[in-house]
Design a protein with these regions (language model features):
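Amphipathic alpha-helical assembly/interaction segments
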Residues: 1-151
Length: 151
């Protein structure tokens, strides 16, 4: 579990999971389901809003995550930023998988939960593939074009 702050994002997944576990012990099933859906919706917002905009002229990425707006300056250690973005999504995938399996369906049969979970993870895979394609295109635009200019 890692924290990432280089890209202007600070995620501490372990802390989030600990908080979720503590809340979970005190909650009724209805409250837990409501809390789980809110947590997932928030994280889905974080991911879907991460489609953002790349400004070639200014060499920066702008995006909204939840209620926060970030500008990531790509000048300088550019590769570090892209790595940090990719790593942050791995953390979100792990967090959402946990939330979905344990909070959303506490009284479901294992079979039903597996089926729902599979569907959810397929959705997450589609979203994360889109994200990786996006960060890959940033890599090509920023780094490959630099090599061409230098060569």
């Amino acid at each position: 579990m890692s924290s990432i702050s280089k890209a202007g994002i600070f995620i501490d997944v372990k802390q989030l999971l600990d908080f979720t576990y503590r809340m979970n012990k005190e909650m009724s099933v209805a409250d837990r389901r409501d809390y789980g859906s809110q947590l997932i919706k928030y994280n889905l917002d974080m991911i879907t809003n991460f489609t953002m905009a790349y400004h070639r002229r200014d060499e920066k990425i702008c995006f909204d995550a939840g209620d926060k707006h970030y500008d990531i300056n790509l000048k300088g250690e550019k590769r570090v930023y892209v790595d940090a973005l990719e790593a942050s999504f791995d953390n979100y995938m792990a967090l959402m998988e946990f939330c979905f399996a344990t909070l959303m369906f506490p009284r479901m049969t294992t079979r039903k939960r597996r089926r729902r979970h599979k569907h959810f993870m397929e959705l997450m895979a589609k979203i994360s593939t889109g994200i990786m394609k996006w960060s890959g295109s940033i890599y090509k635009q920023v780094f490959v074009s630099e090599r061409r200019e230098a060569g």
